[in-house]
Amino acid sequence: DWTRWTCDSKAVIEWRYIDGSKNIVDLRLKDEDDVVHHLEQEPAAVGAFYSDGRLGFHLENDEGLVYWVETDDLIGRGCKAR
């Protein structure tokens, strides 16, 4: 099942862990034709960070931040279930 969150920018994301280890996340942006981004966990100072080199997803305390890695353009922060 997908977890659906809305960000402060009103961007809607859906994401899920694809295995029990929580090392890989599938994430889709609802305004991007439902393209599924397959994100792998990378080192993070705080929380958990996942990326595919294009999209970055940072999780901390049941909130997320999503951005485009190459341009550092923010898609949304404060993403959570609403």
Name these PLM-found stretches.
Residues 1-82:
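Cysteine-centric segments in proteins
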